[in-house]
Amino acid sequence: MLRIVKKLGIILFVSTISINSFAKSMYDDVDSASDYDSTPYYENEGSLVFKMRLGGVVSSAKQKGLPTPTSPQPVSVGEVAKNGYGGDASTTIFFNNYLATELSLGFNVLRTKYTSLAAVAHNYGVDNVKLGKHKPIYMIPATITGQFHIAPYGGIRPYIGIGYHGSYMLTQATGLKIRNGHGAVGQIGVDFYAKDDTLINIDVRQFFLNPKLEYKPNLVGNKTMTSKVKLNPLIVSIGIGFTF
């Protein structure tokens, strides 16, 4: 899945070169046209764009830094969490046709893998632990990105961005605590504009996130044990937007 999304991102980025040329020609046609309504050009005079998106979250959640197991027969721990879902709301502020910044607040859910928690308990001397019901990991990222809109003309407008996020992390999973994290964000997407100041948005963001995990004594024995987890969630979203 990750490879497919990355390939699609490369295709989108390369295709923007030709899109920019085509869109610029449409922009020139509008300037010279006597009948505005007959031209295939979607004008956007708004400097603010508000978007609401829903999407899927792809994450491998690989752990690193676990201590040497105390069990004489350790087992593979595997991934502590798996793919999930989420959404966000954002405001994009345009400084000119090409440059903008996006502020967003999201809410994402990652499914925990209790087989991984059971493996940790086994490796550190607590067998037959009662894990209870599955409790997910919640990720609430506040993100700021700087964007370059490659072809800010016409109805199809791709963009790329880079930024930073701070994420509040929470879980009620038995014996597990996850700390807050932060890191860089890469972004690529495209807006499909209509003539009534609305748009459809497809957005792909790669979050770099390696928060600390704390395993509580009821899961690993007499003391708290910490490790790091390589979440690095890839969020693929689709949504609707409005210009102001």
Swiss-Prot record:
Gene3D superfamilies per record: 2.40.160.20
Q: Keywords in UniProt for this one?
A: Cell outer membrane, Membrane, Signal, Transmembrane, Transmembrane beta strand
According to the record, the signal peptide region is: 1-23
InterPro entries per the record?
A: OMP/PagP_b-brl, OMPW
Kindly give the SUPFAM superfamilies that the UniProt entry links to this protein. Answer: OMPA-like
Cross-referenced Pfam families: OmpW
What is one GO cellular-component annotation here?
A: cell outer membrane
Q: Which GO terms describe its biological process?
A: transmembrane transport
Subcellular location, principal? membrane
- Where does the protein end up? Cell outer membrane
Family recorded in the similarity comment? Belongs to the OmpW/AlkL family.
Q: What is this protein called?
A: Putative outer membrane protein RC0105
